[in-house]
Amino acid sequence: MEELAVEVRGSNGAFYKAFVKDVHEDSITVTFENNWQQEKQIPFHDVRFPPPSGYNKDINESDEVEVYSRANEKEPCCWWLAKVRMIKGEFYVIEYAACDATYNEIVTIDRLRSVNPNKSATKNSFHKVKLDVPEDLRQMCAKDSAHKDFKKAVGAFSVSYDSENYQLVILSVNEVTIKRANMLCDMHFRSLRTKLSLMLRNEEASKQLESSRQLASRFHEQFIVREDLMGLAIGTHGANIQQARKVPGVTAIDLDEDTCTFHIYGEDQEAVKKARTYLEFAEDVIQVPRNLVGKVIGKNGKLIQEIVDKSGVVRVRIEAENDKNISQEEGNVPFVFVGTKDSITNATVLLDYHLNYLKEVDQLRLERLQIDEQLRQIGASSRPPSNRPDKEKGYLSEDCSGTVRGSRPYNNRGRSRRGTGYASGTNSEASNASETESDHRDELSDWSLAPAEDDRDNYHRRGDGRRRGGMRGQGMRGRGGFKGNDDQPRPDNRQRNSRETKARTSDGSLQIRIDCNNERSVHTKTLQNASVEGSRLRTGKDRIQKKEKTDGVDGPQVVVNGVP
């Protein structure tokens, strides 16, 4: 509330600044500046108004002035009457008039002013009006803010409520204030009554709102987001916060930027937790075995991008080996996922599932390799050892097939047709490039159908010692085939479906080995009296010549699968 400032004369003759509190018959009640003295009544003749604003005269030597100074350290500054004795530039030598002894002081112009033209106040200098307040408005009139407009309208410097007498006290220095106050009092009280009614309603509504908020804010979630992730949590132009506020049941969301703390208030726990999922961003590290990093990333990053898209994480990065900020386990590479808690959980589920799949696949492949190795070892151990020295073996070894000089080669060479009792002698390593898996199975079946030694003895042989050709086609043609009549009986006592490995006796044998890859090797062993000329391979021409020579030599012949 604005107060009327006056100057009050003290016992030393100086004037102190004070404010009018109340007006009486012959005095006024004032309060002093900074409350250096208690509130007290001052008679009118010791009270005057301050000089008008802008009032200032030129100060010359021998002029009476007022100096703003203090008598001691306990009292505030006040205005003392003095006289100018000398002027030196901006400095003035003054002599105080209130002192018994001559007292001079040098002051500047900012502490000087001309003598106050206002005289002491009188009874007519102040006007006071009292208005009785209705009972229903007494509480309303006790508020100083309720009379702000009324005070301005009547031109008063003070409007206060006297709680003892239930009156509205109006103080003014203008006589017109009394007339205006009496004229506006009814209107003022009526407006106060309307304001009071509205204020009571607003207060009641505010109380209901506060109680509703307290009821609605029973559920509260508080969490902290890392400072470098606050931008993601807030979202572009606060999009994430707006989305969280739209969750049904959420009443308020507050953010403490200094501590990066979110406060979520809601009507139920589910709404609060759902809003939290939109705002709680974090970073999590998943360790991936180093040998599976490439398979996790995929070609052109396809697999890791699928994990990012399906999980909803913001980004994923693979930390370098020399990064000390992320703890690295030996043999693992850290994958760092950034996003909401739910999205990181989804990414962890997807990545763990994929890692388990890759580990199971590797385990199955390892088991297959172990089984293959065991089969290979079993096949090698089941083969009978050779009695010949290494120098006489030539090209015959465990892993390859060939013929020994002095033995008869197979008759089915080139493009000739094979009978049911014949088998190919092609090296497994040379045939793998052109044979399919189905060919291996067919050829394996052909080997299993090879007749035993006893069965081969029952075949009718030609006069020159060669076996009849296979029964293929109407003309029964084929290289080495017999073109004679087929009226001779043929015994059917051989086993056609035998799959057992056939091995001949030591005096002229054929060994057949089938490994786990359906590869086969044919090993032939000549008679003891067969000559061995070397361990080199023979060309087709050499084979023909050797065949002709063998046909003309008297003596035993080596028979392979019944073919000389």
From Swiss-Prot:
Gene3D superfamilies to which the protein is assigned, alphabetical:
2.30.30.140, K Homology domain, type 1
What sections of the protein cross the membrane?
A: none
Where it sits in the cell: the answer is:
Nucleus; Nucleus, Nucleolus; Chromosome, Centromere; Chromosome
| Keyword terms | Cell membrane, Cell projection, Centromere, Chromosome, Cytoplasm, Membrane, mRNA processing, mRNA splicing, mRNA transport, Neurogenesis, Nucleus, Postsynaptic cell membrane, Repeat, Repressor, Ribonucleoprotein, RNA-binding, Synapse, Synaptosome, Translation regulation, Transport
Give the matching InterPro entries.
Agenet-like_dom, FMR1, FMR1-like_C_core, FMR1_C2, FMRP_KH0, KH_dom, KH_dom_type_1, KH_dom_type_1_sf
GO cellular component: a single term: postsynaptic membrane
Q: Which CDD domains match?
A: KH_I_FMR1_rpt1, KH_I_FMR1_rpt2, KH_I_FMR1_rpt3, Tudor_Agenet_FMR1_rpt1, Tudor_Agenet_FMR1_rpt2
Q: Enumerate composition-biased segments (Low complexity).
A: 426-435
Please provide the Gene Ontology terms (biological process) for this protein: animal organ development; DNA repair; glutamate receptor signaling pathway; membraneless organelle assembly; miRNA-mediated post-transcriptional gene silencing; mRNA export from nucleus; mRNA processing; mRNA transport
Q: Name one GO molecular function term.
A: N6-methyladenosine-containing RNA reader activity
Annotated segments matching region Disordered: 377-510, 529-564
SMART domains given in the database record: KH
* Region annotation RNA-binding RGG-box: where it falls in the sequence: 468-481
Please classify the protein's predominant subcellular localization into one broad category: nucleus
Q: What biological function has been recorded for the protein in this entry?
A: Multifunctional polyribosome-associated RNA-binding protein that plays a central role in neuronal development and synaptic plasticity through the regulation of alternative mRNA splicing, mRNA stability, mRNA dendritic transport and postsynaptic local protein synthesis of target mRNAs. Acts as an mRNA regulator by mediating formation of some phase-separated membraneless compartment: undergoes liquid-liquid phase separation upon binding to target mRNAs, leading to assemble mRNAs into cytoplasmic ribonucleoprotein granules that concentrate mRNAs with associated regulatory factors.
Q: What is the protein name stated in its UniProt record?
A: Fragile X messenger ribonucleoprotein 1 homolog B
